[in-house]
Amino acid sequence: MPKMKTKTAAAKRVRLTATGKVMHAGSGMRHNLEHKSARKRRALKRDDVLQTAQAKKMKGLLG
């Protein structure tokens, strides 16, 4: 049986940590940044951990 291919659309959006968590970039950092406080922009810059159910699906897509 051939190897499973990685879904490249999923690979572009998430990354796996060494401990197996699935990290993703949050929304809200594309435009209208001048109206957001510096504190808010710093908070939005960080990557977030996906919830358990979504992380399980994404790991399946990553192969």
Curated annotation (Swiss-Prot):
GO terms for molecular function: structural constituent of ribosome. Pfam families: Ribosomal_L35p. Keywords: Ribonucleoprotein, Ribosomal protein. One of its GO terms (biological process) is translation. Signal peptide: none annotated. Belongs to the bacterial ribosomal protein bL35 family. This is Large ribosomal subunit protein bL35. It comes from Bifidobacterium animalis subsp. lactis (strain AD011).
